[in-house]
A protein has these predicted regions:
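A cross-kingdom marker of C-terminal helix-rich interaction/assembly modules
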Residues: 1-277
Length: 277
């Protein structure tokens, strides 16, 4: 005689989260499909960086998927680990990845501006390696000590630098990886219209700051599926889904020749609306 499993009534909030999980699954499946078929792309420079960042986004998307709670009417919420901190960390990483994907890869800019961005990227990389090796008490740092000032001068004298605002020029000369601010992204990309709000919330959940710490009590922040944790998990997943979808759509649109076949366009058509929904 078979025993009938007891069921429970799932809350509207839980069902909303599970509906978002389905949307994320659709985006991730399309992302993995495109990722598996990007190997024939022949590109250099910005295109090459775009493919590398896309690969990174794919891996992040898969890793996030592995920690998603997937409760059913037959399972209790506390059987799953509702890890808001890790979900927020993955979501913020995917958000940042999209900004880099756009800025360093697919954004339509002049060759002159692309060259300046490349020079700044090189400077940023060398400054970071110099500081890491210096803190590690390594010898033979002469090339860095000589090269970094020379790179800064090259940026200062670059013909495109004067096209930037004074504030952006300062960021460029310092070697910050991007001279576009979050506000710049909000003003130029519809996908980023809530960028500063989303980034600030995710950052406060990721770091051990008052907003993240003070919310922890006997129910919230313990991973047991409280309404508050489900709500934050839903918000994190919505951000991750939106920016992962934007990355994948951007990849296909940028490399149109490679992904012109109907099997790709059909897959992407399903997730275009998930960039903003």
């Amino acid at each position: 005689m078979k025993h009938k499993l007891k069921t429970r009534v799932q809350s509207e909030l839980e069902l909303s989260f599970l509906a978002e999980v389905k949307k994320y699954d659709n985006v991730l499946n399309a992302t993995k499909f495109i990722s598996r078929n990007q190997h024939k792309i022949m590109t250099t420079g910005r295109g090459l960086r775009a493919t590398r960042i896309f690969t990174r986004q794919t891996i992040l998307g898969i890793s996030l998927d592995k920690i998603l709670p997937r409760p059913t009417k037959y399972t209790h919420l506390d059987l799953f680990n509702w890890d808001v901190v890790s979900l927020a960390a993955f979501a913020r990483n995917i958000l940042e990845g999209y900004l880099s994907f756009h800025y360093f890869g697919i954004e339509d800019i002049s060759d002159e501006e692309a060259e300046l961005r490349f020079f700044i990227l090189q400077l940023h990389r060398n400054i970071e390696w110099f500081e890491i090796r210096k803190l590690n008490n390594e010898d033979n740092l002469d090339d860095f000590e000589k090269g970094i000032p020379e790179q800064k001068e090259r940026i200062k004298n670059h013909p495109f630098l004067s096209s930037l605002s004074k504030y952006q020029q300062g960021l460029a000369i310092k070697g910050l990886e991007m001279y576009k601010t979050k506000q710049n992204f909000e003003e130029s990309l519809l996908i980023c219209k809530d960028l500063r709000r989303d980034y600030r919330l995710l950052s406060n959940l990721v770091h051990p700051l008052p907003i993240a710490i003070e919310r922890i009590d006997d129910e919230k922040g313990r991973g047991v599926g409280s309404d508050a944790d489900i709500s934050f998990s839903l918000l994190c997943l919505m951000v991750a889904r939106k920016y992962l979808a934007a990355t994948t759509v951007g990849m296909v649109d940028f490399f149109q020749e490679r992904f012109s076949d109907k099997k790709y366009s059909a897959s992407i058509a399903l997730i275009r609306e998930l960039m903003s929904e």
